[in-house]
């Protein structure tokens, strides 16, 4: 029989269930929290769908809106979802290009969790008649995940969806 999480396993989770959280508008990677992966002997994907991402254009200061998809194969640590929500919210006043935001998010999550594999895909709403959908991924070097990352990158978005203003 599988047991649930014990209190000592949750000691580093401070944001989930906390009604006194503040929503910071400036980039704050330190808000991210992790917990242990109890299934380290198994490969599996964890996917976050984040439909309310907002950042700022670094030139005009205009807001950019996106749905972000974060998928990863955990190793030892996993990101706690409320901390991820607060982290993504912290991009609200962050001025950067779409491509930079996706790579920053991926790099922060790699530094936090050291996953086997991770990919971050942003689907931004159009501005000026053009939507931008940056995709970035990473597979642990010298492992099957490195080959997986290369394969997924080379085959990414081969059949783009019909865009009807998102």
Curated annotation (Swiss-Prot):
Q: What is the catalytic activity of this protein?
A: 7-aminomethyl-7-carbaguanine + 2 NADP(+) = 7-cyano-7-deazaguanine + 2 NADPH + 3 H(+)
Gene Ontology MF annotations: preQ1 synthase activity
Top class in the EC scheme: oxidoreductase
Task: Give me the segments passing through the membrane.
Answer: none
Indicate whether Repeat appears among the record's keywords.
no
Query: Family assignment?
Result: Belongs to the GTP cyclohydrolase I family. QueF type 1 subfamily.
Q: Provide the protein name.
A: NADPH-dependent 7-cyano-7-deazaguanine reductase
Native source species: Staphylococcus epidermidis (strain ATCC 35984 / DSM 28319 / BCRC 17069 / CCUG 31568 / BM 3577 / RP62A)
Q: Which gene encodes it?
A: queF
């Amino acid at each position: 029989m599988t047991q649930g999480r014990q209190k000592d396993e949750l000691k580093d989770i401070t944001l989930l269930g906390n009604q006194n959280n503040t929503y910071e508008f400036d980039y704050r990677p330190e808000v991210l929290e992790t917990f242990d992966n109890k299934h380290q002997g198994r490969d599996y994907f964890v996917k976050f769908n984040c439909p309310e991402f907002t950042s700022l254009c670094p030139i005009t200061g205009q807001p950019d809106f996106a749905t972000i998809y974060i998928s990863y194969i955990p190793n030892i640590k996993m990101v706690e979802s409320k901390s991820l929500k607060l982290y993504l919210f912290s991009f609200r006043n962050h001025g950067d290009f779409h491509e930079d935001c996706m790579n920053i998010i991926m790099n922060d999550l790699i530094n936090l969790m050291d996953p086997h594999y991770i990919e971050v895909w942003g689907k931004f709403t159009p501005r000026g008649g053009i939507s931008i959908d940056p995709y970035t991924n990473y597979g642990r070097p010298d492992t099957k995940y490195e080959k997986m990352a290369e394969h997924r990158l080379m085959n990414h978005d081969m059949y783009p969806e019909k865009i009807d203003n998102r």
